[in-house]
UniProtKB/Swiss-Prot annotation:
Forms tail fibers that play a role in primary attachment of virion to host receptors. Assembles with Tail fiber assembly protein to form fibers attached to virion tail tip. Fibers are about 35nm long and have a thin, uniform diameter. There are presumaby six fibers per virion. They bind in a reversible manner to host molecules, attaching transiently the virion to the host until tail tip interacts with LamB and injects viral DNA into the cell. It comes from Escherichia phage lambda (Bacteriophage lambda). Residues 603-615 have a biased composition (Polar residues). It is found in: Virion. Belongs to the tail fiber family. GO terms for cellular component: virus tail, fiber. PANTHER family: PROPHAGE SIDE TAIL FIBER PROTEIN HOMOLOG STFQ-RELATED. This is Tail fiber protein. InterPro entries: CarboxyPept-like_regulatory (IPR008969), Phage_lambda_Stf-r1 (IPR005003), Phage_lambda_Stf-r2 (IPR005068), Phage_tail_collar_dom (IPR011083), Phage_tail_collar_dom_sf (IPR037053), Phage_Tail_Fiber_Structural (IPR051934), Stf-like_N (IPR013609). Interacts with Tail fiber assembly protein.
């Protein structure tokens, strides 16, 4: 079941804290609450709050608008916690308050040692793993070294094979040298083949030299694979040269056989020797090529083995570094663990790690027992609470008055000491005394029993008789009434009693303690003129008891429930400067405000028209006035007048003409007949007698034509005029005259100035509005 925490949140000046949120953040798990969950409560404007909090431990955080959150403290709610304020729970003792500081420090040291031990264990595991990795890397390196050794052996074997190939090439060279010697002898036998034999001998010598160089190169390649391959290639090239030289020797020998038959046999032998030398050279070349290939393969294999070995060596170095780092980390963790253990030992030695008692410090165990007599156990807050609850039920020492019905154990009969005697013991003792009286006194016992064992029987009887009413007519009248339910006796006349109905209203009025209460019940009391919540005009700034000014302030709805019915919001209206208006039939809600204003209306304004008639100004003769003299000189007009004419139409037809031939063939041949006018298209001209008649002709008339005209003629006609304006004056006659002007009917703009107060008011007297608290 949840525990109610309620109260008023106040600041240091006692004022309620407004706009604040109370947050409860769970610090640990409980049966109903999960750790780190947050609950919140928003106090009202008066700072009041109320929360039903589940069992658990919470951090209290205050969040005020406009300020950062603040941690107010920690509260613990137990299953048997009593309702209270937040301050009560914040100020209550917690388990941490009852725990010694040295114990908390020791717990922290133990936690740190445990953490360091975990780190050491992890570091140890890492170190073992790194050592295993290093061992594996070492094995891989060893395997790579073995591979490199095998590769070196293979390279050495290849070098030996290359050396054998070189030796074979050398043998071939020696054979070639021998054949060259034979060729030299053959050359000596035939003088005609001397030069050829000498050339063959030189070539053989060169082959021998090259073979020796090839042998030396092959020997060198045994130590360096790359050099061996290069020199083997050189040997191959030299062998090819030897082959070419042998071919040349064969050619020269053949030439010698052609020149000298005697040397044919020698040349043939020389050719066979050269052929043998060529075969040997080819064998040497093939062997050299195989040696070069084997050397190149050995070089590649060696390079691969070296690269693999380098990679594995790098990996081994990295593993070694990792192992070194893991070892360093493990050593550092071990040192920290050792230091933590040392600190724990120091603290343990400081407190002796012994149980504390009343004479020495040490470790104590918590206990919730309330009946223990141990001096080595520490009481928990729960035990303290149980004792305090029990103590609160006891009477204080300075107030011996007891409440309720105290009890005490009943002592045995005959007990005679300072033990408290209860009523049972006293009653038994009295009975024993009575039973122990002589038989002669038994009559008193019987009389006392008959009188109810009242020791003050005489006084009781006297007092009872004194309280009796003497018998008279009034009592007789009352005794004669018949009793009935809800009847009230009254006297109609002297010694004459009657009954009347007693209603609930009558009983209520009779139950009142004062006249004011009766008037209040009847609705005629001092505070009954106005119902709770009605605004009352009050002619003073001093408010009567039971009333409050209406100034927009909040009130306690629980303390004044009737006032809360009128104002459910818990806030009174601010009536300062406001009047009360009856709520219209529609459009307004109760307690709604309406700003000041005037009813919308219009004004009519006009100005009467007035005809001012025709007015005449006064007459005045200005006489004759002369203007001032000024010579304007000679002025030229602007150059203008230029214009052009548009042309359109056509020219007259002209150009028609004809051509005369002037020559004509007559009967006696061509002759010149001079010039004559031809009136038609054909004319005859008579010449001399010897010339005969000549005929002249002309062409028909052709060539008559006309031209069309269009366009604009050239602009012309621009000219200017020179105008002379000499010095002169103009007389101006201004005679006596008057001016008339008409002012017709017209209107004027009228401005109406503002008037009135700052707000709409009527004649009034200022009162305070108060309201009755109820």
């Amino acid at each position: 079941m949840a525990v109610k925490i309620s109260g008023v949140l106040k600041d240091g000046t006692g004022k309620p804290v407004q706009n604040c949120t109370i947050q409860l953040k769970a610090r640990r798990n409980s049966t109903t609450v999960v750790v780190n969950t947050v609950g919140s409560e928003n106090p009202d404007e008066a700072g009041r709050y109320s929360m039903d909090v589940e069992y658990g431990q919470y951090s209290v955080i205050l969040q005020v608008d406009g300020f950062p959150p603040s941690h107010a403290g920690t509260i613990t709610v137990y299953e048997d916690s009593q309702p209270g304020t937040l301050n009560d729970f914040l100020c209550a003792m917690t388990e941490d308050d009852a725990r010694p500081e040295v114990l908390r420090r020791l717990e922290l040291m133990v936690e740190e040692v445990a953490r360091n031990a975990s780190v050491v264990a992890q570091s140890t595991a890492d170190a073992k793993k790194s050592a295993g990795d290093a061992s594996a890397s070492a094995a891989q390196v060893a395997a790579l070294v073995t591979d490199a050794t095998d590769s070196a052996r293979a390279a050495s074997t290849s070098a030996g094979q290359a050396a054998s190939s070189a030796q074979e090439a050398s043998s071939g060279a020696e054979a070639a040298s021998a054949k060259a010697t034979e060729a030299e002898k053959s050359a000596a036998a035939a003088e005609s083949s001397k030069n050829a034999a000498a050339t063959s001998a030189g070539a053989a010598k060169t082959s021998e030299t090259n073979a020796a160089a090839s042998q030396q190169s092959a020997a060198t390649s045994a130590s360096t694979a790359a050099t061996k391959a290069s020199e083997a290639a050189t040997s191959a090239r030299d062998a090819v040269a030897s082959k070419e030289a042998a071919k040349s020797s064969e050619t020269n020998a053949s030439s010698s056989a052609g020149r000298a038959a005697s040397s044919a046999t020698a040349a043939e032998n020389s050719a066979r020797a050269a052929k043998t030398s060529e075969t040997n050279a080819r064998s040497s070349e093939t062997a050299a090529e195989r040696s070069a290939s084997a050397a190149a393969d050995a070089k590649t294999a060696a390079a691969g083995s070296a690269s693999t070995a380098s990679t594995k060596a790098t990996e081994a170095a990295g593993s070694a570094v990792s192992a070194s780092q893991s070892k360093s980390a493990a050593e550092a963790a071990a040192i920290r663990a050792k230091n933590s253990a040392k600190r724990a030992e120091d603290i343990a030695s400081a407190v002796a790690l012994e149980d504390a008692d009343t004479t020495r410090k040490g470790i104590v165990q918590l206990s919730s027992a309330t009946n223990s007599t141990s001096e080595t156990l520490a009481a928990t807050p729960k035990a303290v609470k149980v004792v305090m609850d029990e103590t609160n039920r006891k009477a204080p020492l300075d107030s011996p008055a007891l409440t309720g019905t105290p009890t005490a154990p009943t002592a045995l009969r005959g007990t005679n000491n300072t033990q408290i005697a209860n009523t049972a013991f006293v009653l038994a003792a009295i009975a024993d005394v009575i039973d122990a009286s002589p038989d002669a006194l038994n009559t008193l016992n019987e009389l006392a029993a008959a009188l109810g064992n009242d020791p003050d029987f005489a006084t009781t009887m006297t007092n009872a008789l004194a309280g009796k009413q003497p018998k008279n007519a009034t009592l007789t009248a009352l005794a004669g009434l018949s009793t009935a339910k809800n009847k009230l006796p009254y006297f109609a006349e002297n010694d004459a009693a009657s009954l009347t109905e007693l209603t609930q209203v009558g009983r209520d009025i009779l139950a009142k303690n004062s006249v004011a209460d009766v008037l209040e019940y009847l609705g005629a009391g001092e505070n009954s003129a106005f119902p709770a919540g009605a605004p009352i005009p009050w002619p003073s700034d001093i408010v009567p008891s039971g009333y409050v000014l209406m100034q927009g302030q909040a009130f306690d709805k629980s303390a004044y429930p009737k006032l809360a019915v009128a104002y459910p919001s818990g806030v009174l209206p601010d009536m300062r400067g406001w009047t009360i208006k009856g709520k219209p039939a529609s459009g307004r809600a109760v307690l709604s405000q309406e700003q000041d204003g005037i009813k919308s209306h219009t004004h009519s304004a006009s100005a009467s028209g007035t005809d001012l008639g025709t007015k005449t100004t006064s007459s005045f003769d200005y006489g004759t006035k002369t203007t001032g003299s000024f010579d304007y000189g000679t002025k030229s007009t602007n150059n203008t007048g230029a214009h052009a004419h548009s042309l359109s139409g056509s020219t007259g037809a002209a150009g028609a003409h004809a051509h005369t031939s002037g020559l004509r063939m007559n009967s006696s041949g061509w002759s010149q007949y001079g010039t004559a006018t031809i009136t038609g298209s054909l004319s005859t001209v008579k010449g001399t007698s010897t010339q005969g008649i000549a005929y002249l002709s002309k062409t028909d008339s052709q060539g008559s034509h006309s031209h069309s005209l269009s366009g604009t003629a050239v602009s012309a006609g621009a000219h200017a005029h020179t105008v002379g304006i000499g010095a002169h004056q103009h007389p101006v006659v201004i005679g006596a005259h008057a001016h008339s002007f008409s002012i017709g009917s017209h209107g004027h703009t009228i401005t109406v100035n503002a008037a009135g107060n700052a707000e709409n008011t009527v004649k009034n007297i200022a009162f305070n509005y108060i309201v009755r608290l109820a």
